[in-house]
Each structure stands twice: as structure tokens, then as C-alpha cells.
Amino acid sequence: MNHTRWKLDRERRAAQGYSEPAEAEAERAEVRLAMAFAKAVYDRRKDLGLSQAELAARAGLTQAKISRVEGADAVPTLPLLRRLAHALDASLNIALGTDHEEVTFVARSAA
């Protein structure tokens, strides 16, 4: 059997009608949202050509905090979201649905 035919234990159980406990599904959703936010920060920072240290200076944070945010290791608060949006010169859009989450930074147009 080659690797393309392997299935994760979770996939096999799902195929047999097993479903994860609600707590596991909720935790998985939280991880997906944290990863979506981390990716949005990273992508916008790269679009602006900023280093983590430069973004940290703009946001009044430490480089280590930016690293934790981009590594999905920080729980963002509303003040942190505001600081990052301002530092990234963008509006932050978060769409929460039952089957997906989307986090994007939209560049502010020059006025």
C-alpha cells in the first residue's frame, strides 16, 4: 500500500459513521479560526514588505508578540485587533459561518 491510500484514523471512523464529540469539533473550529487570523496577519505584513519587528514597532508590540500571533499562539483581544489593523493600514473583516471562517485585512484606500 502506498501513502496515497493511507487514511487517518479519524477519516476511517468518519466513514464508518463515527462523529467527533462536540468539544473536539469546537476545539478544531477554534484552531481553524486562529490559523486563519495568523495567515491574514502574515499575508498582509508580507504584502506591505514589513518584517515582524517593523510591524511590532508600528503596532506598539514586541516582535515576539507578532511571532505568537502569526504562529496562532495568541488569543487576539479587540484592542489587539484594532492595533494590528491600524499598523497594517487595513480594515479587518471576520466572517464566521457554521461551516467556515474567513479572516481578511482589506487595504485602506489612499484618501
Task: For every predicted segment, state its role.
Residues 60, 79-95:
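DNA major-groove recognition helix of helix-turn-helix/homeodomain DNA-binding modules
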Residues 45, 56, 85:
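The alpha-helix within a helix-turn-helix
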